[in-house]
Amino acid sequence: MYDISGWKHVFKLDPNKELSDEHLEMICESGTDAVIVGGSDGVTIDNVLHMLVSIRRYAVPCVLEVSDVEAITPGFDFYYIPSVLNSRKVEWVTGVHHEALKEFGDIMDWDEIFMEGYCVLNPEAKVAQLTDAKCDLTEDDVIAYARLADKLLHLPIFYLEYSGTYGEVELVKNVKAELKQAQLYYGGGISNAEQAKEMAQYADTVVVGNIIYDDIKSALKTVKAVKGE
């Protein structure tokens, strides 16, 4: 079994986006610590299965980030369950999770499942619009969500999600200083190695996503930038 606490760099692949076999091989053989499969829309059992089969040709750990109960399938190493803490809709905080547990609770392997406390900070992002996230937050607001995830809910992961735009480094630094046990994931807007390295100073795990589809070479350079190899 893999130890997620040691993951410094992960790639996130959207099953609803096209990725060539060549580029997928580059991603899986890049030295990244893991590949997360997940997206905000268009996620189906068919495209998740296609992605799973493709990734399983390689040794890299793979994780399904569950956004739709209908797209859950066995075969992944881990399953990340996001709870959008700053959503205005209870379904995205605990509602969908309750439905999943009602349907699959008896057969879940709890050693494979990790809850993520999301704080979505880009109002233009699909995930913000889908979940009706309250994004006009002060730093105190964000730190309060971090404390909620870390100290009250004891979640293993607190995820700062800027999705498509590069975040505030100082905020990431201050959030990290608040966390005692939760692992800090940062995702959003990383388009080059320098940005990845900058965020890696404070985030435990840097998530690289959109740049994979826009500039594969720049995406690959983020691995060494984060891991310092």
UniProtKB/Swiss-Prot annotation:
EC number of the protein: 2.5.1.n9
Family, as annotated: Belongs to the GGGP/HepGP synthase family. Group I subfamily.
A Pfam family hit: PcrB
Protein name: Heptaprenylglyceryl phosphate synthase
Protein residues bound to Mg(2+): D14, S40
Keywords, alphabetical: Lipid biosynthesis, Lipid metabolism, Magnesium, Metal-binding, Phospholipid biosynthesis, Phospholipid metabolism, Transferase
Its biological purpose: Prenyltransferase that catalyzes in vivo the transfer of the heptaprenyl moiety of heptaprenyl pyrophosphate (HepPP; 35 carbon atoms) to the C3 hydroxyl of sn-glycerol-1-phosphate (G1P), producing heptaprenylglyceryl phosphate (HepGP). This reaction is an ether-bond-formation step in the biosynthesis of archaea-type G1P-based membrane lipids found in Bacillales.
Pathway(s) served: Membrane lipid metabolism; glycerophospholipid metabolism
Gene it is expressed from: pcrB
KW Magnesium (keyword) present: yes
Catalytic reactions of this protein: sn-glycerol 1-phosphate + all-trans-heptaprenyl diphosphate = 3-heptaprenyl-sn-glycero-1-phosphate + diphosphate
Lineage: Bacteria, Bacillati, Bacillota, Bacilli, Bacillales
One of the GO BP terms on file: glycerophospholipid biosynthetic process
Positions that bind sn-glycerol 1-phosphate: K12, Y159, L160, E161, Y162, S163, G164, G189, G209, N210
Molecular function GO terms recorded: heptaprenylglyceryl phosphate synthase activity; magnesium ion binding
Co-factor requirement: Mg(2+)
